[in-house]
Amino acid sequence: PKLRSKVGMVFQHFELFPHLDLTRNLTLAQEIVLGRDSATARAKAGALLERVGLSAHAHKHPGQLSGGQQQRVAIARALSMDPMAMLFDEPTSALDPEMVNEVLDVMVELAEEGMTMMVVTHEMGFARRVANRVVFMEDGAIIEDSPTDRFFRDAASPQAQRFLSKILPHLSLIHI
């Protein structure tokens, strides 16, 4: 299989099929792209919805869910394709603040299980907790690329230092 079929992608606006229920959102690509039979795809969808805490909503359509729930469905859909790695494009930026943690909790679990993830995020507490490298960008350019502990302890670039000086006082108030 091509590399792109082994990489899961989760966008900031979920990109779920609004006319399909959650189960079908998770089974469609499994059946078409991976060639899984319907029963196997449905079983995997059910297990993944359970994993992200949404099995009771399997029959619902995306519009009937909160933003945080929709994003967890998007993560489950990406996982349904058995990816080797996951890409996340600002997965919490479109969410109400109270929904952010339910998505980050799922992502922390993935990291703890060893899933390779590349995450574009402004959630520095999350990055500090799960990342092994931080790539700091400004205006589309890579400014700094360093191990997480070094980035947060002793950022090399003035831009990263300025950014961190604004957010680090707030991170100390958050349990990481």
What are these regions (language model features)?
Residues P1-T148:
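ABC family nucleotide-binding domain
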Residues T92, I174-I176:
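Conserved small/polar residues in nucleotide/adenosyl-binding loops
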Residues D149-L173:
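C-terminal boundary and immediately downstream tail of ABC-type ATPase nucleotide-binding domains
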